[in-house]
Amino acid sequence: MSIREQWLENKAFYERRFHAHKFISYLQTYTNTYMSLEQFQEIVLAAADDPNLVGIAISTRPDCVNDAYLEFLAQLKQSRNLDIDIELGLQTVNYHNLVEINRGHTLAEYIDAVLRIKRCGLSTTAHVILNLPGDTELDVIETAKIISVLGVDFAKLHSLYVVGGTELGRRYEAGAFTMISLQEYVERVVTFLEYLDPEIVIQRLVGKGPQDNLLFCNWDTSWWKIKDAIDAEFIARNSKQGSKFDYLNGKALRLKNSRNKG
């Protein structure tokens, strides 16, 4: 089915089922800029003429962001009055773990992509995984800090899921690593959000894995139970997103001046 056909079919479904009137075209699966510029333009424009389209969201990798593609999107945004967002898979700022999980890019490529996107006047979403084997709470905190410093607009959280028949699946079945507990994951999510800029919009707290061949996903717990646990942890801490967002603009100097005034 062509992109245009997918757009028309899904639009009709949401109009009928949810009485929706405005839509965002979401190019999610795989790396949506890993193609020629001409192919990319054709795919993006498949829904661009729809008068009910208000935005386009494009998922891709940090090492597949190029100025020519961004300039096309910036022009489209201006000419069609659309919100355009680029969703990047960061996962973690832990350089060693990015290598270990074979991401194929490092933190540098992510930073470069975000800066280029922002220069073109587009928004960006950070996709992060807070329970990667080898990551600690310090990695979680630093991930929140880097995202905040870069002025990312949106964030999506997803726990790690393991699919059979993959290298990660083989390592999991061999006992090469273990997953943290659900409670520890909940605590990491809350800590991450405490250090995150409160202006960053959370698009997703809990994700789902594919239906088939899963070895591990969400501790075999319903997504809404995980969400409720996150809410409960916030209440227990009497906390909220951004409660520890105090580390920018020369924190050490501000603390020194505060002590001197005291």
Can you annotate each of these PLM segments?
Residues 1-10, 14-37, 52-65, 82-109, ...:
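Core AdoMet radical
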Residues 2, 35, 39, 101-109, ...:
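Alpha-helix N-cap and loop-to-helix initiation/capping positions
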Residues 14-18, 43-51, 71-83, 115-119:
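Acidic (Asp/Glu)-rich catalytic clusters
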Residues 31-35, 62-65, 131-136, 163, ...:
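Short, small-residue-enriched loops and turns at beta-alpha junctions
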Residues 37-45, 66-77, 98, 140:
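Distinct, well-ordered alpha-helical segments
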Residues 44-51, 56, 83-86, 144-150:
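Alpha/beta enzyme core
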Residues 108-167, 183-206:
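Conserved C-terminal portion of the radical SAM core fold
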Residues 154, 162-262:
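Auxiliary Fe-S-binding modules of radical SAM enzymes
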